[in-house]
Amino acid sequence: MASTLSPSITPQTEEPPVVPVRIQNAADISVIVIYFIVVLAVGLWSMVRSNRGTVGGFFLAGHDMAWWPMGASLFASNIGSNHFVGLAGTGAASGIAIAAVEWNALLMVLVLGWVFLPIYIKAGVLTMPEYLRKRFGGKRLQIYLSVLSLFIMVALQTSSIIFSGAIFIQLALGLNLYLAVFILLAITAFYTVAGGLASVIYTDSVQTFIMLLGSLILMGFAFAEVGGYESFTEKYMNAIPSVVEGDNLTISPKCYTPQPDSFHVFRDPVTGDIPWPGLIFGMTILAIWYWCADQVIVQRCLCGKNMSHVKAACILCGYLKLLPMFLMVMPGMISRILYTDKVACVVPSECEKQCGTAVGCTNYAYPTLVLELMPDGLRGLMLSVMLASLMSSLTSIFNSASTLFTIDLYTKIRKKASERELMIAGRIFGMVLIAVSILWVPLVQVSQNGQLFHYIGSVSSYLGPPLGAVFMLAIFFKRVNEQGAFWGLMVGLVVGLIRLIAEFVYGTGSCVAPSNCPKIICGVHYMYFAIILFFVSIIVILGVSFLTEPIPDVHLYRLCWSLWNNTEERIDLDAEELETQEEAGGALEEDSEQSRGCLKRACCLLCGLQNTGPKLTKEEEAALRQKFSDTSEKPLWRTVMNINAVLLLGVAVFVHAYFA
C-alpha cells in the first residue's frame, strides 16, 4: 500500500512551509566537506598542470584532452540538478516517457562526433558563431548567435539549474536561498574563472563519478523500499493522493490518477502528454541544435587529442545517457508511491501546505526521496551528488559563455586586443555572468510553473529549431548563403517569440486550471511546434539563398560536407579583417615578468596569465593550426570507434523497443 508523507508544517501558516533541516549530523556534514575538498583539490591540480596562458589553452584545454574526461564532461555538462529534479518530477507525474528524450541523445551525440565535429575541427574554430562567420562571412550572424546563446545560457540553462538546486538545498540545509546560491556560485566561479576548460573538464570527471555512485545507491534503496520492479509497476498505478477535492474546484480524475500509458515511451499522437511523433521528430530537431551546435557541448569535443579520442568521448557519453531512466525517472516515480500526498498533490491549497507551491509538488519528488529514505552519511553523499550536478553544469556554462563573449563579441569591440587582454576579458565576463545569474534568481522563483522539464523543453522548442536548421544546412548544403541563413534565423526568431511571449502572458496553465491562451497560438504541442518552426526556417533559408548569389567554392573548402576533403587553400570571406587583427595584436608588447609587482605576479599566476614562452613564428603558428585541424585517424582505432557506434545504436533501438 502506498504510504504518505505526513507534513511537518502547521496548516494555519500563511507563509510557504518551513521544512525542518534534514542534514545536521556529523556523518552528512563530513561527507559534504570531503566532497568540496576533493573538487577544489582536483580543480587546483588541473590549474597547475594545464596551460591557461593562451586562448587555446584556457578555452580549449590546449587541444590535449583524453577521451574519458571529455566524455564524462559531456555527460556532466548535460546532466545538471535540473535533470534530477525535472526528470524525476515528470516521471512522478506521468511515467517513463520523458526518459526517451534522454535516449534521443544517443543518436545525436554520434551525429556530433561523426558528422559535425570533423567540419568544426577542419574549420579551426573556437566557437559556433565563429564557424558561421567563416562559413557565411559578415558579422551579423556571429553577433546574433552569440547574443542569443548568452541569453539562452542565463535565462534558460542557468536559471533552471539554480532553481532546481535551490529546491534541494533549502530542503536539506534550511539555508536562505540567496546565501546558498552565492556560496555555490562563488566556489564554482573560483576554478572556472581561474582554471579554464581543463579545470572544468577534470572536475566534471570527478563529479560524474560522484553523481553515478550516489544515484545508483539511491536507486537501490528506492527499489528495495518499494519491493522490487514488479511491485513498483503495480503500486505506481495506485498512487493517488488522499485529498482530491477542495478550494471550490471540480478536479477531473485524470489530474491525479496515473496515466494508463505510464510505462510506455510511445504515446498517443493527439492526446499524449509526450506524443510519439513529437518525441521522435520534434526532440531530434532540438537535439540537432543542442548536441551538434550548442557551444557548451561542442566546446568539450573541440579540445580532444585527436579525432579518435573525440569519437570515443561521444560514445562514452552515449552509453551514460542510457542511465537517467533508471537513476532519475524511476526513483521519481517511486517517490510518488512512498510520499503520495506530497508528490502527487492536486488541490492548490494542499500543495501550498506540502511544498509552498500551488501548481504542484512533483519537482520535490527526488529531493524528498533523498531526505526521507537515505540514512545518515548517504544523505550527505546525495546532497554532494546534487551539488556536483549543479556545479558541473554551471562551470560548463560559465566557461562557454566566457568563450562566446571573448571570441565573438569582445574582439569586435577591441579589434587590437592582445592575447593577454582577451584572457582577462574572458575571466571578467565570467564573473559578470555569475553576478547576473544571482540577480536572475527572483525570476526563477516566480517561473516555477508546472513541471520543470516541460518548461525547459518548451522554451527550447521556441528558440532552438532555427539554429538547428541553419547549422544543418550550412554543413550539408553549400548553396546556402549568408542572406538565407540570416533571414531564416530572423523569421524563426519572430515566430518562436510569438509563442513564447503568449505563454508568458497567458501562462501555460495546469490540469486543474487550463491556460486561456488562444488555441491558434498555443494549441499546438511544443514538440510539434518545434517541427513546424524547423521547416518554416528551412523554407526561408533555402528560398532566400536561391534568390541571391551563391558563395564561391574557394571560400567553402573544408567548411561543408561536400568539400570536406578538399586540400586546396581556402580564402576566408573575412581574410582581410583577420589579417588586420593579427597585425594589431602582434604589435602589442607584453610586460615582462620582472617588471611586475608581487601582487600582480600572484594574480597572473592564479589566472594563468604568466608568460609561457617566446612568441611563435608564423611558420610555427601555421604548423600548430595544421595540427589542431587534423581529423585523420589510425585505421585500427577508426574501426574500433565505428563498431562501438553501431553497438550503441543497437542498444538505443533495443531500449526504445522494450519500453515502447
From Swiss-Prot:
GO CC annotations on file: membrane; plasma membrane
Tissue specificity remark: Expressed in small intestine. Expressed in kidney.
Catalysed reactions, as listed in the record: D-glucose(out) + 2 Na(+)(out) = D-glucose(in) + 2 Na(+)(in)
Subcellular location: Cell membrane
Record-stated family: Belongs to the sodium:solute symporter (SSF) (TC 2.A.21) family.
GO molecular function terms attached to this record: carbohydrate:monoatomic cation symporter activity; low-affinity D-glucose:sodium symporter activity
Membrane topology: Multi-pass membrane protein
A Pfam cross-reference name: SSF
Topological domains, Cytoplasmic: 1-27, 76-82, 127-142, 188-208, 299-313, 402-423, 477-484, 548-639
UniProt entry keywords in alphabetical sequence: Cell membrane, Membrane, Transmembrane, Transmembrane helix
Main function: Low-affinity sodium/D-glucose symporter. Generates D-glucose-induced depolarization in a pH-independent manner.
Gene Ontology biological-process annotations: carbohydrate transport; D-glucose transmembrane transport; sodium ion transport
Extracellular side stretches: 49-54, 104-105, 164-166, 230-277, 335-380, 445-455, 506-526
Chief subcellular location: membrane
Source domain of life: Eukaryota
Summary of activators and inhibitors of this protein: Inhibited by phlorizin.
Record-given protein name: Solute carrier family 5 member 4B
Naturally occurring in which organism (per UniProt): Mus musculus
Entry's transmembrane regions: 28-48, 55-75, 83-103, 106-126, 143-163, 167-187, 209-229, 278-298, 314-334, 381-401, 424-444, 456-476, 485-505, 527-547, 640-660
UniProt cross-references to InterPro entries, sorted A to Z: Na/Glc_symporter_sf (IPR038377), Na/solute_symporter (IPR001734), Na/solute_symporter_CS (IPR018212)
Induction notes from the record: Significantly increased by cadnium.
